[in-house]
């Protein structure tokens, strides 16, 4: 008589966040804040005992500058901390993903605010991001490993109503994602989006 292995997991995620906005000049504003997580996960997964407890605070900061009445520049930075749902080869949850994001760009309004254009450049680094590593032949459960990836890209967008009969909404995004060895990573994610 065999014994069936099962999963019975209880998890609690509590987020705390706060921010403050400062006007440095009439044209320049700064926002700073944090996003904190208290995370607890206990139970059993296919025979493996699960007992995780994590707490982490991630800061972020950003600034905007009104170049003209219709053109604004911005820059932002944030830390990343995200618990994961994927298991490793031993049936344990992967440790959280940690990293940092940076973005800079412009937003401009044209034709009496009827057309909005944006351009953004972004880059991110993530450590311990879940990547498929195989299938357990006994349980048929997928397992994953944590990898480090770097991504960068840009986005261009046009949106607005130029006339009563002409509305435009167009965008293009390009992203490059590489692992520690410089190989393409996250191949499931599109590299060009129109």
Model-found features: residue ranges?
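Structural signature of Gram-negative outer-membrane beta-barrels, strongest in the C-terminal barrel
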Residues: 7-126, 173
